[in-house]
Amino acid sequence: MITTQKTARLPKRAQVMRWMAAAMLPIAVVACSTEELLKANYPDQIEPAGLSTSLQGASALYAGAIGDFTVAFSGSAAGGFGQVMTTGYMTDEFAFGGTPPEIRQFDLRSVDASNGIGASTYNGLHSAREAAVRAAGVFKAIAPTDPRGGEMKALEAMLIVLMGENYCSGAPISTTTPTLTYGPSLTTVQALTLAVSTADAALALAGANAQVKSLAAVTKARAQLDLGQHAAAAATVAAVPTSFVYYVKHGTATERQKSITFTQGYNSHSFLVSNKEGINGLDFATAKDPRLPVDGSGAPSDFDVVTPMYFFAKYNSQDHAVVVSSGVEARLIEAEAALNASNPALWLSKLTEARVPYSMAAPADPGTAAERVDLMFRERAFAMFATAHRLGDLRRLVRQYGRDPAKVWPTGAYHKNGLTRGTDQNMAVPATEKNNPNFTACINRGA
């Protein structure tokens, strides 16, 4: 409420004194530096130097790194497909119900090195890694006991795991901290070994924070599993509770925060759950598995008028969460270690533990070694659907279990346009990486 009040008339002497005080104001102004007068103070903003010297700056870097990781991992409606979508298309998880050829290349498993979506996805992964590196370094320098430093290191490790799992052997890792240094090409084994040591650094920085310790442990074990170190991987996650979940979350405040998987799925009808894709694909859309809720009747997409419309119901809003790492994954890692140790009883026990959060009955032992491997990877596929695990798992089926690629990957005739699927088993490093003088080409495009 605004009120008005009349001003009383001042005595003559008081009027004179007020006039003298007012007359002195210009003198005071002249006595001040004009630079100081024009320098605005914004207490809610951080000067660039403060990013690396204050806890407030470290917190800002942390928030930025989480945002960059979310975009690199799960994409953004503002642009950037992320690892979830690109690997989902390349495997049997998702079918493309649209028409743009650059996206279709992923679903065909025939991605050109000049593909713009491939380049932005790859660049996003490395930008997020560098953001995590910088934030972790600042926390280590000014607040070494803050568990967020360990969290940043764990996310750095996760991004290296994703590079090792999803890209060809020979992808380099460069750094911009403190200055730009071009990295050499790394084999898949070298990249995953680096991920293990980075996760170890995260564990050392986690302190007593159970959430960060579990994130770092599952990330390390995932890399160990990729390296074929099954027993070591199981030991790494032994203390991780099944209830553990680490996730990132989209939002609605800005376009960058919004979910591209929702936009391309429920809105555009192009990012669609697959069903027995390319002969070898699993029955994701029709299995009625509680771990993989599906919307849609299977009617043709409104976009291409061909692809059956099934939507992943966990990603049914612009602000959904995406699981990055979990205790369920820890139990599945232990199960696979037991399978490789020829201990089917323990294997089934661990599979059952991984089903508990979904109130599912224990699985039956199929009996043969090959069928047990099939069940192991089916359990992983449904429990970790659309979380950027499947491409690495299909590669492991070929690399570690000796499966024929033609019997693992979606193959044969494409479901539209009269096209035939390609033979890519990973994503190529984009042509833009040739700016790096240490990189020439992928070393190996196999599993």
Regions flagged by a language model, labelled:
Residues 33-151, 158-162, 166, 170-192, ...:
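Short acidic-aromatic linear motifs embedded in glycine-rich loops, typified by GG[WY][YF]DAGD(H)
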